[in-house]
Amino acid sequence: MRRALILGSLIALLAAPAMAQGNNAINVFGVVDKIDASTVVVKNDDGGAVETFKIAPNVLYIQQAAAKLSDIKSNDFVASEAVRKEDGKLHSTELRIFSEKMRGIGEGQRPMNDAKNQTMTNATVTGTAITNGSNVMKVKFPGGESDLILDPDPNIPVFKFTDTTASAVTAGAKVRVQGVRNAEGATVNRITVMP
């Protein structure tokens, strides 16, 4: 269930602006079979197919880890899935704290694909407050700002993404690889090591 949630939601969240969209985009969850300086071989979680990807020279290595609401601070660049409830306000259902290198990725607020009353917001935290027992996170993005309600629910997942190096990507590691397919083959420019 957790993997399905992450798979469904992070596609829009982490897609790089320069990355090709549609059928040419690579977004694969799997386990590393082997890796060297120029390629990474991944066994896909979806069906178990094994595929070799070229590693782009400017590849970004990311480590994903569990975090807490208290880890979020002013000026952090974050992403929030949220649902608009009966009170008309956006209540976060999942939060992610990005590294500085990821600042600006997917920035803005938009409806989630085929999800009724759900939105994805990638924005900079400008402050927090407490209203009716819930934290309210204020965020700003180009062309707008928003209040996100952080209900006191321990089941709301929070993740932190930090920069790492190729040394974190070893055989047996759970990863998410992103990139693009073209006439020259499949190349990844982002490798995220999953918990």
Residue ranges and their predicted role:
Residues 2-5, 10-12, 17-195:
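Short, flexible, surface-exposed loop segments at domain boundaries
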